[in-house]
Regions:
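Catalytic strand-loop segment that frames the active site of acyl-thioester-processing enzymes
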Residues: 3-78
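Generic structural detector for well-ordered beta-strands
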Residues: 38-42, 109, 160-162
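HotDog/MaoC-like acyl-thioester-processing domains
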Residues: 3-36, 114-119, 123-167
Length: 167
């Protein structure tokens, strides 16, 4: 079961998280420079194996427990494809409460692996905003990080989106 921890007291399944409407109210959503939003991530070994299979990543390091034990990682690690999917989905989930959104660019740097049964914090911060929502659209640039509980950066990311009044 994929778990996204919205806060310490509450855990919900990955699939249910993105169906929820109450993760953040419209009044809490902002496109101000410096605004950030975050979620906690905790994946089990079974989650990692299932997600790698679901996204078509057949690298043994994501599903073969025996072979992965003999690697520098010492066990199964999450697929970059799967992590980037979960992580990037935070952006439309956040912004779609206030405007229509189109993704324009996204890049990831995987600094360290995502291991099972460790809690990670995924966050995005708005770096710049340009344009007009009712005109050609607002271009929003974001930077993001995924960090472990010791604040070690596992993943760094950049994204550029467009917010529009209508699609």
């Amino acid at each position: 079961m994929y778990l996204l921890h919205v806060n310490v007291e509450e855990s919900i399944s990955y699939r249910d998280f993105f169906k929820r409407d109450n993760a953040m109210t419209n009044s809490e959503v902002s496109c101000a420079i410096g605004k950030s939003f975050s979620k906690d991530l905790l994946l089990t070994k079974e989650d990692i194996i299932e997600q790698a299979a679901f996204c078509g990543d057949e690298n043994f390091i994501h599903h073969d427990e025996d072979r992965s034990l003999n690697t520098r990682f010492g066990g199964v690690i999450a697929s970059g494809s799967a992590i980037s999917s979960i992580y990037s989905a935070m952006i439309p989930t956040y912004f779609s409460k206030i405007a229509n959104i189109l993704g324009l660019e996204m890049s990831f740097q995987f600094k360290a692996p995502i291991y099972p049964d460790i809690r990670y914090s995924m966050s995005w911060m708005i770096e710049s905003v340009a344009g007009d929502l009712n005109g050609t659209g607002k271009i929003v640039c974001l930077t993001g990080t995924i960090r472990d509980s010791e604040q070690k950066t596992q993943v760094m990311a950049q994204a550029k989106i467009m917010l529009l009044s209508t699609l």
